[in-house]
A protein has these predicted regions:
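Short membrane-interface helical motifs at transmembrane helix boundaries
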Residues: 77-104, 282-309
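Alpha-helical transmembrane segments of multi-pass membrane proteins
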Residues: 38, 97-123, 244, 301-327
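Hydrophobic alpha-helical transmembrane segments
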Residues: 138-153, 157-185, 365-389
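Interhelical loop/hinge segments that connect adjacent transmembrane helices in multipass membrane
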Residues: 1-4, 99-102, 161-214, 390-398
Length: 398
């Protein structure tokens, strides 16, 4: 429980700082809101394989630099793909010419954005998985103080969306230097064994993330056809929804520290269930309190009243995310990443079909909110069923 509280405090600090960062983007204009939302959807897809190294490390827990290199290599590859396909990607969304031009400019330096972002994220996670929570908190402070200071400068003197994204990249670089200096990881290049582990564990995990995020992109693309105002409402509400995930992510991060203490599947399962029962009331309460805090901070140029009552339906996603994170952790600790792929496939297809069905109805925004719960709860059911069957067949050490 103490790990959860410590990580939760760090994650709440992160979410508030991220909301302030988003607010700078959103204050520029409604075009900036739409472009930022579209850019983040693109990033969610392409960073799936740019995080393949750290996905593998979650299971192996050794040879840190070898897996960080895979983040860097795949980040460069993803950046090249985005730059090559830039015109095609920009035209996926139903954007105005001004919005397309703004998005095109951001995609020009996506390779740098994704490499530094995934490297920083990988090192942050390594520190957390090692249980070095004091260094983790200090590193977060370094990153966010740099980010907000640079954001403030860029907004006050330029109000340029591109420079706000450059501020993020520079802040990542500063935090990477700070963390590597203090962590003192043994420098290693990838070898045949780490490559095998990436193929065995990381590839299925990255594929699951990619598939899930492709359907989330389609989710955003479908939403863009509701018109600029409704898409703007969706973008703000969904960005709040994504920020709220930081609470359940803190819960899952604590599980990733505690669950491996169990030597058998049954012990790990019991660790998960005990943690779940202890944390549930606190997570639900925080979810709804911070829903309104994040909304007030990040609504930007969109009138606050236009987000009601839709934001309530978007925030219900926590009831699906909570069991999802619980059983996902068990899949990772047991090295069964293929289960994640199966569950996500089912969940995202359900999300996509429901949104498509209700797109042109008067209550489309309500549906686009509630499908977050339906998607993740469906995944958790699949994870639980498959894990149970594998356990009964003796596929785990019980």
């Amino acid at each position: 429980m103490k790990e959860f509280i410590s990580i939760l405090i760090s994650f709440i600090f992160m979410s508030l700082a991220d909301s302030i960062d988003s607010a700078f983007n959103n204050l520029i204009s409604i075009d900036a809101i739409v472009v930022t939302g579209s850019f983040l959807l693109i990033d969610y897809i392409f960073k799936s394989f740019a995080e393949i190294g750290i996905y593998t490390y979650r299971t192996t827990r050794k040879n840190e630099w070898q897996y960080l290199w895979f983040n860097i290599i795949f980040g460069i590859l993803m950046g090249i793909i985005v730059l090559t396909c830039k015109n095609l990607i920009v035209n996926i969304f139903n954007l105005s010419d001004t919005q397309k031009n703004m998005l095109s400019i951001l995609l020009n330096f996506y390779a740098i954005y994704v490499v530094f972002g995934r490297l920083a994220n990988g090192i942050f996670e390594i520190i957390r998985l090692k249980g070095q929570l004091k260094l983790y908190r200090k590193s977060l402070i370094v990153y966010y103080v740099s980010l907000i200071a640079l954001d403030t400068f860029a907004y006050l003197f330029t109000k340029n969306l591109t420079l706000l994204f450059v501020a993020t990249i520079v802040s990542w670089l500063i935090s990477v230097i700070y963390m590597l200096y203090n962590l003192k990881l043994k420098f290693e290049l990838p070898n045949k064994n780490s490559l095998k582990n990436v193929i065995k564990y990381g590839f299925a995990y990255s594929s699951e993330r990619l598939l899930s995020r492709i359907f989330l992109l389609l989710y955003g693309v479908i939403a863009s056809h509701m018109g600029t105002e409704k898409y703007g409402i969706h973008t703000v509400c969904y960005s709040v929804c994504l920020t709220l995930e930081i609470i359940t992510n803190a819960y899952q991060a604590a599980l990733m520290i505690k669950v491996p203490e169990g030597k058998t599947y049954i012990e790990q399962y019991n660790n998960c269930i005990n943690m779940r029962n202890k944390c549930f009331p606190l997570i639900i309460a925080l979810n709804f309190v911070f829903t309104f805090i994040y909304l007030v901070i990040s609504h930007g140029s969109l009138p606050l009243n236009k987000c009601f009552p839709y934001i309530i339906f978007y925030s219900l996603g926590v009831f699906g995310l909570y069991p999802y994170e619980t059983y996902k952790t068990l899949c990772i600790s047991q090295g069964k990443s293929f289960i994640l792929l199966i569950g996500s496939t089912i969940g995202v297809i359900i999300r996509f079909l429901i949104c498509l069905l209700f797109l042109n109805t008067p209550f489309a925004l309500f549906v686009f909110g509630i499908v977050n719960f339906i998607d993740f709860f469906s995944r958790s059911i699949v994870y639980r069923i498959v894990l149970s069957k594998l356990c009964k067949k003796g596929n785990f050490s019980i």
